[in-house]
Amino acid sequence: LFQLELKNIPKSFTRLAQRFGPVFTLYVGSRRVVVVHGIKAVKEVLPGPQGRVLGQRRHPAFHAHRDRGIIFNNGPTWKDIRRFSLTTLRNYGMGKQGNESRIQREAHFLLEALRKTQGQPFDPTFLIGCAPCNVIADILFRKRFDYNDEKFLRLMYLFNENFQGLSCPWLQLYNNFPSLLHYLPGSHRKVMKNVAEIKEYVSERVKEHHQSLDPNCPRDLTDCLLVEMEKEKHSAERLYTMDGITVTVADLFFAGTETTSTTLRYGLLILMKYPEIEEKLHEEIDRVIGPSRIPAIKDRQEMPYMHAVVHEIQRFITLVPSNLPHEATRDTIFRGYIIPKGTVIVPTLDSVLYHNQEFPDPEKFKPEHLVDESGKFKYSDYFKPFSAGKRVCAGEGLARMELFLLLSAILQHFNLKPLVDPKDIDISPVNIGFGCIPPRFKLCVIPRS
């Protein structure tokens, strides 16, 4: 434990990997942790044969979600519920035209809200977050919130506070010593309180859906899960329960809001730091889309620079640098090492996204990392911000689409204006734990003529 820098655990893992190699064991208290570092080892352990014996490590702060849902579920229901949720998400437009139109509709409301700032400084944390939150709310609840709705803003505040809380040093300690620290004051108490409040809100929505459910005409993903529950209500072994559905929907609501929101916000800060990159994006948008047509996914083919910038933002910030910690569900052997059941396994994504041969000067923000010599977008097999294998992010397709369409729409209509000289903008994260937390900032958005 004392070899870890709690404010930047991924940095500690990198330092230890340089000393001990790509696979090493450390003990946090009595807990055995195996860190897997570097592209070769990570690709072996996630999509490879070992991926089949990896479960999700239970997170003490999310004890209320224990063995339910799809994020921190390590129980027997996880595989089937995840598979059904993914299929239903695809049916509701995941990566297809259905979600494209959802995002385009929401982009209209986001642009209107940005215009109302009238060029004055504002904190983008919740305003920018409204768009991805409404997109996932429509998929889950067939509901759209007004940007000034108090409950809407409260939910986004809880999502944001939990993402930051999970990344603070105290939570890193609590995750490894929950029995010792549970009764002490600390940020773990706030996270658990927030989890309970989010779950209560989602539970109310699920109950409302159940009361008005038409099994022949499901309105959204929540209805689809409830239909499955009704199908097996006479079964001895039930996969779907009201509480399980609530946790699954809450997982998707949190993940579908906060990750995309934080990435967009961090992206705006980076673009203000590098106005020459923003200018190149304006030129590409003007040439391909023009001033009035709403951006579409088909534009990606003609906008390699925007496509590269969106990917480079994700690579550079490495939103979840140490991945979601996994756990060996049975004894296994990896690279000749015996890994006992219950061992925590950490496949580090930052070691892949910051690979210095694939991405020269990886600590620098360079869209050229993903552009080839002819100026076309260059896909990299090292681009793994959504993880890999059976636990890959369920919303990867939706997130990719949101980032491209929303960022394109913002830059189509606005110039970003920082409150300080670009060279004085600090784009270093304020905390790196579960997630990579960007600094708070204000900006102005100036309508383009």
Swiss-Prot record:
Associated pathway: Lipid metabolism; fatty acid metabolism
UniProtKB keywords: Endoplasmic reticulum, Fatty acid metabolism, Heme, Iron, Lipid metabolism, Membrane, Metal-binding, Microsome, Mitochondrion, Mitochondrion inner membrane, Monooxygenase, NADP, Oxidoreductase
Top-level lineage group: Eukaryota
Family of this protein: Belongs to the cytochrome P450 family.
Cellular compartments per GO CC: endoplasmic reticulum membrane; mitochondrial inner membrane
Activity regulation details: The omega-1 hydroxylase activity is stimulated by cytochrome b5.
Role summary: A cytochrome P450 monooxygenase involved in the metabolism of fatty acids. Mechanistically, uses molecular oxygen inserting one oxygen atom into a substrate, and reducing the second into a water molecule, with two electrons provided by NADPH via cytochrome P450 reductase (NADPH--hemoprotein reductase). Catalyzes the hydroxylation of carbon-hydrogen bonds. Hydroxylates fatty acids specifically at the omega-1 position displaying the highest catalytic activity for saturated fatty acids. May be involved in the oxidative metabolism of xenobiotics.
Uppermost EC category: oxidoreductase
UniProt signal peptide: none
GO BP term, pick one: xenobiotic metabolic process
Enzyme Commission number(s): 1.14.14.1, 1.14.13.n7
Catalyses which reaction(s): an organic molecule + reduced [NADPH--hemoprotein reductase] + O2 = an alcohol + oxidized [NADPH--hemoprotein reductase] + H2O + H(+); (5Z,8Z,11Z)-eicosatrienoate + reduced [NADPH--hemoprotein reductase] + O2 = 19-hydroxy-(5Z,8Z,11Z)-eicosatrienoate + oxidized [NADPH--hemoprotein reductase] + H2O + H(+); (5Z,8Z,11Z,14Z,17Z)-eicosapentaenoate + reduced [NADPH--hemoprotein reductase] + O2 = 19-hydroxy-(5Z,8Z,11Z,14Z,17Z)-eicosapentaenoate + oxidized [NADPH--hemoprotein reductase] + H2O + H(+); (4Z,7Z,10Z,13Z,16Z,19Z)-docosahexaenoate + reduced [NADPH--hemoprotein reductase] + O2 = 21-hydroxy-(4Z,7Z,10Z,13Z,16Z,19Z)-docosahexaenoate + oxidized [NADPH--hemoprotein reductase] + H2O + H(+)
Location in the cell: Endoplasmic reticulum membrane; Microsome membrane; Mitochondrion inner membrane
Topology in membrane: Peripheral membrane protein
Subunit details: Interacts with chaperones HSP70 and HSP90; this interaction is required for initial targeting to mitochondria.
Keyword ATP-binding in record: no
Stimuli inducing this protein: By ethanol.
Record GO terms (molecular function): arachidonate epoxygenase activity; heme binding; Hsp70 protein binding; Hsp90 protein binding; iron ion binding; oxidoreductase activity, acting on paired donors, with incorporation or reduction of molecular oxygen, reduced flavin or flavoprotein as one donor, and incorporation of one atom of oxygen
Binding locations of heme: 393
SUPFAM superfamilies referenced in this protein's UniProt entry, alphabetically: Cytochrome P450 (SSF48264)
Protein name, UniProt field: Cytochrome P450 2E1
Protein residues bound to substrate: 254-259
Main localization of the protein described in the UniProt heading: endoplasmic reticulum
PANTHER family for this protein: CYTOCHROME P450 2E1 (PTHR24300:SF356), CYTOCHROME P450 508A4-RELATED (PTHR24300)
